[in-house]
Amino acid sequence: MNANDTSTGTGTGTVSIKVWSDYVCPFCMLAEGPLHEATHDLDVAIEWMPFELRPHPTPTLRPEDDYLPAIWARAVYPMARRMGVDITLPTVSPQPYTRLAFEGYQYAAEHGRAAEYTPRMLRAFFQENRDIGRLDVLTDIARELGLDGHGFAQALTAGTYTAAHEEALRTAAAYRVTVAPTLIIGERHRIEGVPSPAQIRKAVLDIQAEQAVAHGAACGIDGC
């Protein structure tokens, strides 16, 4: 396991689940529930992975334009109601770039708060209408998570984690990630969009079954 993992087990059959998300993607927040419902009793290591839907200088979306209200009315709000998730289209305009928030994620990961950071950032934007593109807002959230606010702000101002974030984006490109959320389960199963608990659970159990068969078909130094 590493600092980015939310692990519910420590056995050799632990299945990795990589989740690429962006903090301004409502479907990433909606994916949290199915993910945890499917895996709460399974041996998995969940790692949230950075992905910028609209990196600078690509213009970000504006809630007063037609697109966001339309997609929220057609897809986000109906799904959220079915899932019982409290989520609201933020009024922050234009929507923030998320590079700085993701550099903050790298700081959080290095200081043992990666698992809490991504869900907290999603709640800050979609439930609290906070501008997560602002350093002062990010620093307040970091303090809420028990991180050193001064050290956090200093690191982001200095660009200490810029290279780590750029490497994370290269990893996303290597996995051919183009949408958020994207889940890679055990390096074998790929799910794009909000998954159902059944999809995730089946993928994890299938991999664990394959691991069990592979382990059973070998002899160790102490016998077969």
Residue locations for each model-derived region?
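Structural alpha/beta surface segment adjacent to cysteine/selenocysteine redox centers
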Residues: 29-125, 218-220, 224
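Local sequence-structure signature of Cys/Sec-based thiol-disulfide redox active-site neighborhoods
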Residues: 12-35
